[in-house]
Regions:
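A cross-family phosphate/adenosyl-ligand binding-site feature
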Residues: 2-3, 14-94
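Conserved acidic residues
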Residues: 97-98
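Short, glycine-rich nucleotide/cofactor-binding loops
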Residues: 5-12, 112
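Hydrophobic/aromatic ligand-binding patch that stacks against planar heteroaromatic rings
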Residues: 121-125
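Glycine/threonine-rich flexible loop motifs
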Residues: 107-116
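C-terminal accessory domains and tails appended to enzymatic cores
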Residues: 162-166, 176-269
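Short, glycine-/small-residue-rich phosphate/pyrophosphate-handling segment
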Residues: 133-162
Length: 269
């Protein structure tokens, strides 16, 4: 099995190295990641400047490729360009059997998943038809990637066979940052819809110009027992199936009951 590994923390991130070691147990690993941290860039892609992809060698061996772009850029380059270089001119996204993005420093829960470069990389993979999984670890300052990696390996081993059974879908896995003995288990979850209370701190830079730092916190909504935010807070590993079909089918059904057949004709009269 050919596995594409990427992230948004950058090619030098500890979590990426741990993930590579994990995925080598499952197949051939190919790494394409940003050359610097790209956290919270979402699903942005680079259009106004050229992309560069350079080889990264560690211990005398090729570790992977660093790209001066976003996680989505990395996935696109890997699936549509690097695949041709490695596997032949007729190769493309189908050359890879699986894409795994992570191990991200910091959980990607609720609506924060929309801002996450880690999740966006998995989304880009599934858009191209490659089964994809995003894996994140709670916490920022002190993250035990060794422990998280062991948990991720066991969870991935169980869910990896489900990766291609549902089109347009991928998995978003979040691991709590607590001692392993306190992790209560693994739960299938849904995405929490809590918003973010946006606030900005106004400061002055050394030149006396006004600058702003974004801050704030999660807007408390009623959490349900099976949503990702609640489960992680309760010490569970959350596994959330996500998809890129953003259609609101309930609203679509309601709108279809409204007679709009005459609206264009009225405008033309």
């Amino acid at each position: 099995m050919r596995i594409l590994v990427t992230n948004d923390d950058g090619i030098d991130a500890d979590g990426l190295s741990v993930l590579c070691s994990i995925m080598e147990r499952f197949g051939e690993v190919y790494v394409v990641a940003p050359d610097n941290e790209q956290s919270a860039v979402g699903h942005s892609i680079t259009l106004a400047q050229p992309l560069r992809m350079r080889e990264v060698v560690r211990g005398g061996k090729l570790f992977g490729y660093a790209v001066n772009g976003t996680p989505a850029d990395c996935v696109k380059l890997a699936l549509y360009e690097l695949s041709r270089r490695l596997f032949g001119e007729d190769s493309g996204p189908g050359s890879f059997d699986l894409l795994v993005s992570g191990l991200n420093r910091g959980a990607n829960l609720g609506i924060n998943a929309f801002y996450s470069g880690t999740v966006a990389a998995a989304l880009e993979g599934v858009i191209a038809g490659v089964p994809s999984i995003a894996v994140s670890v709670e916490g920022y300052s002190q993250v035990d990637f060794g422990q998280a990696g062991g948990i991720a390996r066991r969870v991935l081993a169980r869910v990896i066979d489900c990766r291609s059974q549902v089109p347009w879908s991928f998995l978003n896995i979040n691991i709590p940052s607590v001692p392993e003995g306190r992790i209560r288990g693994v739960r299938i979850s849904k995405q929490n819809i809590s918003g973010f209370q946006e606030r900005f701190e106004e400061r002055k830079d050394p030149r006396g110009e006004t600058i702003y730092w974004m801050t704030g916190g999660i807007v408390p909504l009623q959490e349900k027992s099976d949503d990702d935010t609640k489960l992680l807070a309760d010490g569970y590993v959350s596994v959330t199936p996500l998809c890129y079909d953003m259609t609101n089918y309930r609203l679509k059904e309601r709108l279809e009951k409204i007679d709009m057949s005459h609206l264009v004709k009225e405008e033309q009269q």
